[in-house]
């Protein structure tokens, strides 16, 4: 079994914090008539949550598929209801946390 590096574990911690921050920001500005500002998905190591971020970027459609975007700030975006998005994000956070726990276990 390949031993995960300390750097990979730091990435896992970053993933958890990043996903939780996005949940907070999304729920704070869940009204579709308000501008929703999310942490840019182009930040280093943030790509694990970028797929959920792209789900919110309805203004960036290319050939019917969601294109990558740095910010979701379109005031006319149709947003998912907060509870649905929380489920999406929490599943991502849970997966990341489990991966992190497995990584820690391999050190012991």
Curated annotation (Swiss-Prot):
Q: Which UniProt keywords apply?
A: Glycoprotein
Per the UniProt annotation, where are the glycans attached? 33
Put simply, this protein is called Uncharacterized protein YJL009W
Mod. after translation: N-glycosylated.
State the superkingdom. Answer: Eukaryota
């Amino acid at each position: 079994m390949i031993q995960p590096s300390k750097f990979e574990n730091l990435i896992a911690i970053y993933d958890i914090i990043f996903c939780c921050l996005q949940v907070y920001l999304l729920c704070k500005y869940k009204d579709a008539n308000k501008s929703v500002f999310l942490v840019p998905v182009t930040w280093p190591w943030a790509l694990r949550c970028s797929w959920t971020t792209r789900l919110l970027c309805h203004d960036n459609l290319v050939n019917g598929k969601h294109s990558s975007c740095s910010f979701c700030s379109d005031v006319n975006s149709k947003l998912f209801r907060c509870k649905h998005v929380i489920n999406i994000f929490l599943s991502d956070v849970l997966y990341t946390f489990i991966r992190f726990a497995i990584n820690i276990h391999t050190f012991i």
